Amino acid sequence: MTTSTNIHDQRILILDFGSQYTQLIARRIREIGVYCELWSWDVDEADIRDFNPNGIILSGGPESVTGDESPRAPQYVFEAGVPVFGVCYGMQTMAEQLGGKVAGSSMREFGYAQVEIVEPTSFFKNIEDAVAEDGNGLLDVWMSHGDKVVEIPSDFVKVAQTDTCPFAAIANEEKHFYGVQFHPEVTHTRQGMRIIENFVLNICGCENLWTSANIIEDAIANIKEQVGDDEVILGLSGGVDSSVVAMLLHRAIGDKLTCVFVDNGLLRLNEGEQVMDMFGDHFGLNIVHVKAEDRFLNALAGENDPEAKRKIIGHAFIDVFDEESKKLKNAKWLAQGTIYPDVIESAASKNGKAHVIKSHHNVGGLPDDMEMGLVEPLRELFKDEVRKIGLELGLPYNMLYRHPFPGPGLGVRVLGEVKKEYCDLLRRADAIFIEELHSADLYNKVSQAFTVFLPVRSVGVMGDGRKYDWVVSLRAVETIDFMTAHWAHLPYDFLGKVSNRIINEVDGISRVVYDISGKPPATIEWE
């Protein structure tokens, strides 16, 4: 079964050379309405042929093209007969592989720059931020490079320059090969979206087929084709990903879906009641409510290592699903909310340079002998795309745009060993923090906010007595892409109010601190 529109028919291939911004390129292309995939640079020619892209983008990267062992694009990229767009490192390796030269620079260019367009091409057609005195177009861009192209291939022309970068953009119009030394995918490059859009839609000739309505239609058709008349079991947490999966499956197979809501003791305050009310009472899904707090906490007893805790929680979920599936006669499929960044992070490059940043319980840690097949309808989607189709499916905005919550829940927000006492205290403290953020109209002004339980006691004075009670840390960050983040400068009066409420209303907590660490060097979550 297929949809009336093949939404994968026109597509862009992005080869990843390791830039922290590479996923942004893919997200920008999806926002334009075109499907794309992100692969490691060391892909085989046969795989590119099979994918048959309308165009290829070579990403930036941290290494130097001048190094003997530095990554190179497969030569077939330049023989495939499709447009190629090199970004930063991608432009440098393209230039060198096609006969140009790259050299290290005595002056590293990092930050804002103004690029002067010196040669009219289809690549920058009608795209500029300002006009120079000589009539040339000017672009405000974001640079991040040390090396630079010092000689271009003989069949290329110089398109743009800066005072310190003689080849800020290059082009071979006949072959539709283009390169820029700046990063169009970041918001700091003001016309970046238009540059990418022009390449994808006009130069590569792609259509805007990748829309929320088409994605939903395609996902439903694929689910029906994959599972047939079998029953499917889904772990419903109430988070964005599992909620959207539940709605897609419900539309596709109706009552053949059984959602298992596992109350593992690691959820937010009143989350269980909210999930059952929304999906059971309002949307009419078939939900099995499993109360497994003791099971999870017993499995976590004595464990302090964050990665080990993630694996324990993941295995416990799978065990519960296996048990529940045995009660369903035809349950042969386990649905999961795996999304595209999970897949990217968990995929190791063939050359061994890639590594798993954090294990995702949706992708890693699954037992080899798991008895069910996997259904992952969101596997191709970024989080912003998941939210958009969630709205299209009728889920409420405030649920879809809630701050991120880790899959292992409070299991990684209670530092060290996880105990029921710690979780109960953390739940109440966190609820106060989030409630006050909403009351002060600050919730949507920060990207993520939560409370962390610290397993240390601190002296406090309550009434006439001294007592030793626990410490919690408030964490709030501002970020565009969650790759880097700044700590949120919340008002002192606000922080004081939250601290007073937590200490006065949550018996067992004597001290509240505020985390002012950025990412990097710290990560957003503590574990």
From Swiss-Prot:
Location of the Glutamine amidotransferase type-1 domain: 11-209
Pathway note: Purine metabolism; GMP biosynthesis; GMP from XMP (L-Gln route): step 1/1
UniProt keyword list: ATP-binding, Glutamine amidotransferase, GMP biosynthesis, Ligase, Nucleotide-binding, Purine biosynthesis
Domain GMPS ATP-PPase, chain residue ranges per copy: 210-402
Protein name (database record): GMP synthase [glutamine-hydrolyzing]
The encoding gene: guaA
Database matches in SUPFAM superfamilies: Adenine nucleotide alpha hydrolases-like (SSF52402), Class I glutamine amidotransferase-like (SSF52317), GMP synthetase C-terminal dimerisation domain (SSF54810)
Pfam families: GATase, GMP_synt_C, NAD_synthase
Role description: Catalyzes the synthesis of GMP from XMP.
Domain of life: Bacteria
Cysteine disulfide partners in this protein: none
Gene Ontology CC annotations of this record: cytosol
A GO term for molecular function: GMP synthase activity
Gene3D superfamilies: 3.30.300.10, 3.40.50.880, HUPs
Known partners and oligomeric status: Homodimer.
Keyword field contains Mitochondrion: no
Annotated ATP binding sites: S237, G238, G239, V240, D241, S242, S243
